[in-house]
Amino acid sequence: MIEHDVKNLSLAAEGRLKIEWAEQSMPVLRQVRERFTHEQPLKGIRIGACLHVTTETAVLMLTLKAGGAQLALCASNPLSTQDDTAAALVREYEIATFAHKGEDNDRYYRHITSVLGARPQVTMDDGADLISQIHGARKDLIGDVIGGTEETTTGVIRLRAMEREGVLAFPVIAVNDADTKHLFDNRYGTGQSTIDGILRATNILLAGRTVVVAGYGMCGRGVAARAKGLGAHVIVTEIEPMRALEAVMDGFQVMPMAKAAPLGDVFVTVTGNTSVLSSDQFGQLKDGAILCNSGHFNVEIDLVTLGAMARARRTVRPFVEEFVLDRGQRVYVLGEGRLINLAAAEGHPASVMDMSFANQALSAEYMVEHGRTLAKKVFVVPREIDLEIARLKLGSMGVAIDELTKAQREYLASWTHGT
């Protein structure tokens, strides 16, 4: 059997059914797979992927395999793995997979090491952990790598920092920055799946509660809109004036976190930064305040400080930990401060991941074809790929659009037409 470390191979049949279910909602990726099967653009290419091991990721892996790639996959978050999906990838599809839901940090990094043991020529990241390891403990692999792709905002931030410092050793495509990714996955996917995770973990009623959303990027906008749609009173906190202004114009209250802390019933961090909720806020929180994160790494809520401040802590439900502070107020942290939409729920719906993962597949193809001549920089997804994915998605939805007439094209190309 293919090399692997998954929790329970007996779950494979169940996982396959779920993968097939997700695939039905991923028509763009299915079309990419059909072409890949015929053209074999990834034939013999070793791809190492560190992604959330979900049914949607499985459909991406099958697409890459159909294109001829040799694959090794590990989880990009200790709590995001779907164990039945991981089992199916190994037993049903013979894809080397290293992922356990709830794995500790040691196992998490052992799994990354296992993927790097395949000596990938293309890396595929969600958070830049593979690339970080290659530039750290595994510099010996740099010569093998043609280039990489990065799925999420947090990873792109890390990679742009590496580029600025002149240490990025190969080109990387920022899949996150494609319009067909961040305008849909980040906003509609994160918005829906974050609320889904909160409700699955807590079974609370959001209507009438005050939800504080930290960060008003695409992910924060989605969370705020969905919370408002369920009847919550939404407060937004921001550090960037343009986004704060957008939040105000969208009808939300905007204020500093120091003012929001005593008002909120539920707090959702979606910033990609550290210590968004920290000791300055913990003492001001209401009794029963719920804290969760949807911004990738588990650093947005300062859990070390919260734990030190607590006189007692216990797990009260799956994915819900209670901290009792000095004056007796109870604070609840969901999913260990990790991505709540993947810790307590199933992540984004397949229909939105269809576009994100089509970007991944086509960016990998582009990197194989062009990566050896690209500078050691972070690149955006080529516009023609972005537009083709949008066209394919519209077609799969039965939506037709207009085209410019010859006269309209000439008008737009001319500078002589005025009032």
Model-flagged regions — what are they?
Residues 51-69, 181, 185, 189-263, ...:
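Glycine-rich phosphate/diphosphate-binding loop of Rossmann-like nucleotide-binding domains
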Residues 31-34, 65, 119, 131-132, ...:
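Rossmann-fold NAD(P) dinucleotide-binding segment
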Residues 60, 84-86, 110-111, 132-139, ...:
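Short acidic, glycine/serine/threonine-rich loops at helix termini
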Residues 69-82, 235-237:
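Short internal beta-strands
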Residues 2, 11-27, 42-46, 54, ...:
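Adenosine-phosphate binding glycine-rich loop
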Residues 75, 123-127, 139-154, 273, ...:
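ADP-ribose/adenylate-binding Rossmann-like module
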Residues 2-42, 75-81, 86-209:
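Glycine/serine-rich phosphate-binding loop and adjoining beta1-alpha1 elements at the start
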